[in-house]
From Swiss-Prot:
Its main location: mitochondrion. It is found in: Mitochondrion inner membrane. The lineage of its organism: Eukaryota, Metazoa, Chordata, Craniata, Vertebrata. Core subunit of the mitochondrial membrane respiratory chain NADH dehydrogenase (Complex I) which catalyzes electron transfer from NADH through the respiratory chain, using ubiquinone as an electron acceptor. Part of the enzyme membrane arm which is embedded in the lipid bilayer and involved in proton translocation. This is NADH-ubiquinone oxidoreductase chain 4L. It comes from Otaria byronia (South American sea lion). Its EC number is 7.1.1.2. The gene is MT-ND4L.
Length: 98
């Protein structure tokens, strides 16, 4: 495994550990999810370019589209929760159930 792949894998791991440790605030959880998606995008793009997978060249762009949709939904949920309750604690999300 080259150092570039190792660094990208470490970025994913640090984001995952951050997601597991700092899950009380919604904003920190969203930032960790974005870090994971960004490292997956870079890893997928580099793997496709290095191995010459021409049929899978659209996969990183599709992943980036899903990451953008996830970020938009997460930020809209963050705005709604912070306007309603004044904080961005994840415990407030249980109050949104019908």
């Amino acid at each position: 495994m080259s150092m570039v792949y190792f660094n990208i894998f470490m970025a994913f791991t640090v984001s995952l550990v951050g997601l597991l440790m700092y899950r009380s605030h919604l904003m920190s959880s969203l930032l960790c999810l974005e870090g994971m998606m960004l490292s997956l995008f870079v890893l997928m793009s580099m793997t496709i370019l290095n191995n010459h997978f021409t049929l899978a060249s659209m996969a990183p762009i599709i992943l980036l589209v899903f990451a953008a949709c996830e970020a938009a939904l997460g930020l809209s949920l963050l705005v709604m929760v912070s306007n309603t309750y004044g904080t961005d604690y994840v415990q407030n999300l249980n109050l949104l159930q019908c």
